[in-house]
Amino acid sequence: AVLTEDGVLGLAPSIRERYQRFPFDIEPVTGMPICDMAPGLKSWNYIEASIALAAVNAFFNRPDRMPDKAEIYPGGRRSRNVFTKFWESHTKDRRTLFSEPMYERDELRNIPGMIDILRRDEDRTYRDYLYTAYRELLPSCDQLTVSGKSFVSKLAGPMLRYAAELEKKTLLWGMDIPLCPSLMDRGIDHITGFIADDAEECFRLVKRGAVRDDILRFGHFVSIEKQ
């Protein structure tokens, strides 16, 4: 997580590796400008890329940057149910390929429609597909949904380019997704991200290693649709 001087929080996933294969290109330090941290998202050092994504989210995911037609969901404990309500109203009749969701397979069992899940080998269960299967799966799906974790792991780029070739609907969904309207100009159809209402408390929970649903209680989701 990254907390700005004016009290805005940006979240990002944590990807653990057995050993660090790549050094830091941009060493993050307290007080560093966001514009200096953001290029680290391109790094193959997953820690560096994760911190950079959190910095990007701290820049975009704030109430004063939301477009007028953004859909704002209820916060607090109700944030935990936003994904289910969104899926029921937007995608229940579609087959979806979901890359590295922040939800476990069992949490999606009551979600309408068909969802195929892609994960890196380190995170995969026997019911998930290995990430390299996207070329076989995506042609038979109606849409591709990508999490922030896939931007850190570098899976998002190839998948989104392939989805564009196939003219599939593309969605970015998760508490680690930047609410950046200009992404719509790059072919993204829908974005749902998270805004922390109590940034200090969210930051404290992240440092403590709290579970996802505890953090969600102190913020709300926002959706942006391509017009």
Range-by-range predicted roles:
Residues 1-102, 226-227:
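Electropositive, gly/pro-rich neighborhoods at or near active sites that engage anionic ligands
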Residues 97, 143-147, 171:
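Structural motif
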Residues 168-227:
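C-terminal functional extensions of proteins
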